[in-house]
């Protein structure tokens, strides 16, 4: 019983399923007898963990940029109820633009996906100005007024904002100081008497100075000389430390935790960064060469939200589903397969085995919630492979193949973490040769 609690048998079955699929990656669909020729569109509709880029709702858009909000994670499924407090936003802006001052009712983790930004945080005693580059991240506490500038003359800015809601679970609201055609300043909601007393000025002067509609939207063009003046005071992110209490940090400020000729994974955990510790979040950046495979693995505690930033990826995720037949409840393995394009998002629940293949050169960013004390357990590869730690006597009773066959199979792969996604045992017709697979995998074909 102690062994089962530490290493659930269904995870072993999951890696067997993933490994059999990896032998021929063109093999698609779901387990349990579902049609193998199921279309990508059909698989997407049946995958509650997949969010296409068209699942973003446009909150604001003009000629200078846009702000989009991903639908609630639990909007269409109860399987992601644990993510009800989290929302994902995407901010894009053209060169030399300003996102007007505002504050959010949620804690925000801001991550630069593309371009450069000047972020200014306003506080009662002054303001902090930071220059953000690609891969930089920073926590913005709820209620903190801030504004964003794209200082570049040519490159667009793209930022991912991860919101941790608490006032109204799952609801993110921004409060803008300025009046626009879309929404008046929140100051305008106060009565004339309150405003006159607060500013010790007549209402006409207050209205003309603070409240009249000035802009077409919350993203506006900004003169270059004004940008240069603000940029003079900007601090860059620290590449030497991960533990700053309030300053930006970069995802690639340290060596990757996994790296070889096929790919790299950079990761910052709550244990290494106080801002992430406050939010109980991990951040990672996955880079893979075309054709590489990130071998089957699972996270012990963290549920990871993966965003396809550049390139395309084939993802296979193994989970359990409850089935009821003749009044009896049972569990069934299910494989969720998807091809991700730029802007798509997939959620990897904790304990669900997953494998990814780069269909092109690939860059993805991951945000893991409930991340403190998380461990990543690999189910294939030479290093950190938990199956390799199972003694032969137990393997004899766990798998169809003998313990010796299991050990021989696991020794075949000399690489770790990232491997060549093209199986070596391919016949002239492009199909995996089953005869060369040990008994461990034959029963899953």
Curated annotation (Swiss-Prot):
Signal sequence residues: 1-26
Coiled-coil ranges from the UniProt annotation: none
InterPro entries: Cupin_1, RmlC-like_jellyroll, RmlC_Cupin_sf, Seed_Storage-Functional
Family annotation (SMART domains): Cupin_1
GO cellular component terms attached to this protein's record: protein-containing complex
Keywords: Seed storage protein, Signal, Storage protein
Single annotated GO MF: nutrient reservoir activity
A UniProt-annotated Pfam family: Cupin_1
Domain Cupin type-1: 49-207, 249-407
Subunit structure, as described in the record: Homotrimer.
Purpose: Seed storage protein.
Sequence similarity: Belongs to the 7S seed storage protein family.
Protein name according to UniProt: Canavalin
Species, as recorded: Canavalia ensiformis (Jack bean)
